[in-house]
Amino acid sequence: LRRTGYMGTDEFMGVRPLGFHPVPGEWYRVKVEVCGNRIRIFLNDEKQPHIDLVDKNADLVPSGEVALGGGWIETEFDDLTVTPMADDALKNVKVAEYQKKATPTEKENKRRQERASYTSAKLAALTGSRTDITLDGNWLFMPDYQLDNKDKAVSVQTNDQDWHIMSVPNFWTPIRIWLHGETMPSPTGAQPKGVSDTYYQQETDRCENYTFDYRRVKYAWYRQWLELPANVEGKNMTLTFDAVSKIAEIYINGTLATSHLGMFGEIQVDGSRLLKPGKNLITVKVTRKMDGSASESANAIDFFYSSVRESEQEDAKVEVNKDALLKEIPHGFYGDEPAGIWQPVKLTITDPVKVEDVFIKPTLNGATFDVTLKNHGSKKKQFDLYTDIIDKETGAVLYSGLSIRKLNLNADEERMETYTISDLKPRLWTPQHPNLYDFKFRLVADKGTELDCLTETSGFRTFEVKDGLFYLNGNKYWLRGGNHIPFALAPNDENLANTFMQLMKAGNIDVTRTHTTPWNKRWMTAADRNGIGVSFEGTWSWLMIHSTPIPDQRLIEIWRNEFLGLLKKYRNHPSLLFWTVNNEMKFYDNDSNLERAKEKYRIISDVVKEMRRIDPTRPICFDSNYQATGK
């Protein structure tokens, strides 16, 4: 609803979902009631209006004529009638709008059907030396307002037939992020619709259709039953949660295995001593709000956007809102306190001697490898390390050979081995030819027994800065790209990732940045495959922007550790060209306090030193920015 007004007083009044898709060729009846400062919009024969609001500026437009027309599509209007209303016609009529919501009985029936169709995760047999089982899919779910008892929530004895079903990975809240979640003013208050009616309604409907009231949930319990075969006894079993927002407590068969604070960090849980053959229960408590705060996240995105263009003269305004802006964990541009197990979950089963981590440092004719190995067992173990490099497209073997002979690891010992393979002739990775290889790292014991085999997909390419210019594979380039792409709207939609990146390629865009929020494995893998170069940004946009105070040291540590963890997680992706610390920090010439600006520099400098230690192969950009004030 938009109301025209005198001398520039036109106003956007509100937007509401129809609840159905209009059909071309059909007629729809619309009734508009205007009585004093009240406006009500009815559709067809519904008894309640779709829009019912008070126009605070009605006195500016006390009278006028009626006109028909407008719209973006060809529309026919007919049978217009105008009927006078008494001045007090709506005096005793409460403001109430039509809402199409499921009744409690309908929701309970749906919950029972979904619960009846739930099946536990099951691994029938181990597959080779390393077995990965995805735990994505339906999990049991119980909000805090229905269960506020930890012992009952985590117990394997608890009857969970009355639990809800929640998909993983997913948020249990609607995604409200920057351009798709910003508020628009209206007489009834701010409306966080953003630029897309369709997306806003899609996310709202997703959460309204849950069998619980997502608005009431402060924290929730997730449960997943998992059946394992008999021969997992004595194996190393690692649970990996790519990301949980925002606080996670993970229990295995009733025992607390680990806890984690942060929205983007990977959580690895050694479940070797807690998981067993047969039936197991994984329980996760996910908390939406820190310390009971109900308003900080809700206000943060609005303040971010309103303050990001503020100049240093408005220092006081920024500091007044420091609690709403800074005293919460990094969440990118996400607003409205997103919560849930929102990135994939898997269980990895290996021998106690395993490859823990691999860092591939490519050149144009080979690579240097940092391979971290660990013996989780109770006895010393000897083995050989082999490396295979296989073209992912053709299956051709580029290299296969023994890399290190007779390695010895004592019980519970972890060690990193470094070696180089050279004189290869690989197909290089470029945006035009995104050639990828599977790098296999095999641990082989006596008599050829394979203890572990980790496969990492990567590519051969170099990216560096020399004399102020960028060089990809030794060739000089000007760097120009476009952003941002819709990762944050659908972080687990692989089809969207591939489709959008192909559209970018069709539009001659080969480079972008992970603006608004860091990407996950699905989108980074899509960038590798589609040939999209990436500037990977940090998790805290506008950190210490302008003249804002320095955040609490605990928050700085959360940001630092989480971001450095992402470097280790994604440093093998060839599409990742360089790291960017954050988006628009801009304190370097916009902080009115020079000593505070120097301290901010020291904080960032310490993090950058760690970034260079974790990944010495890539350039680092201070922040994503544009022309500085007055420069």
Regions found by a protein language model. Name each.
Residues 591-631:
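Extracellular glycoside hydrolase catalytic/binding regions
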Residues 1-103:
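Extracellular glycan-recognition regions
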Residues 174-228, 232-240, 245-252, 258, ...:
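Active-site-adjacent substrate/metal-binding segments within catalytic domains
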Residues 273-279, 372-464:
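Extended acidic/polar, glycine-enriched regions
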